[in-house]
Amino acid sequence: TEMKAMISQPMKGMNAEEILGVREKAKAVLENEGYEVVDTYFTDEPEPDVVNRPLHFLAMSLAKMSECEAVYFCRGWDAARGCIIEQAAATAYGLDVILE
């Protein structure tokens, strides 16, 4: 079976078009390396009881990470709190960390 990877990217202050543009480039790199890319671009609104949207989406990303062997970190990841946590999790749980 194909190895799976997800993309960790800064999103703050970016619109959907910019986010998806960065994702497409990262996806091409990963597919070229033989990975299947797990989608972690979430657009659904959280349930009304969610009081911290960024934390909700981070939790969803971490759940998706459990399906992956690797995580690709886009440029600027080290200044984005969600990406920093994803990098710590990927490292702690033995996933391959790929830096742009």
Which role does the model predict for each range below?
Residues 1-100:
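Conserved catalytic or regulatory cores that recognize and/or transform ribose-phosphate-containing ligands
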